[in-house]
Amino acid sequence: MNHPVFKPSFARTDARGVFHEIRNGDEIWKSVNLGEMRQGAVLGNHYHTTSRLFFFMLSGKVRIDFLHAKTGERDTIELNPLEGVYLEPYESHAILFLDSGRFMLLKSEAFNPKKPDIYPLKADEGGSR
């Protein structure tokens, strides 16, 4: 399993401030979320069967442990501010906040409480913690 880390593809700075283009592609996101977590918080330890996600750090640092639900393959990456990664279907993910931080989460599907597409699976068991 390989998880490339994405950085902004474009940045413009002028007298008004800074503008970063995070992704420029043909993805269509149905859910856009902003979050803020404390140091030591863990998100995830689950996977999705149909949803594709893009997780992007705005501030702070995280470690993400991946475990593929079908193959058992593992991967671990760290993200710093202005870095992001795709979370593909069947990839269980445990996102550990190494610092307090803010993030953006884009989802290919809106959350449906009647059919949540969330399946518990600890990705950080036996990992590098």
Regions found by a protein language model. Give the residues of each.
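A short, N-terminal "cap"/entry segment at the start of jelly-roll beta-barrel domains
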Residues: 1-30, 44
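Double-stranded beta-helix
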Residues: 2-4, 9-12, 94, 98-129
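Short beta-strand His + acidic residue motifs that chelate non-heme Fe in jelly-roll/DSBH
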Residues: 19, 45, 64-65, 87, ...
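Conserved short histidine dyad/triad with adjacent acidic residue
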Residues: 33-50
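Tight coil/turn sites that cap or link beta-strands
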Residues: 37-40, 82, 88-90, 100
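A generic "binding-loop/recognition-motif" signal
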Residues: 50, 83, 91, 99, ...
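Glycine- and acidic-residue-biased ligand/ion/polar-headgroup-sensing regions
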Residues: 50-63
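Short acidic-glycine-tyrosine-enriched beta hairpin
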Residues: 69-89
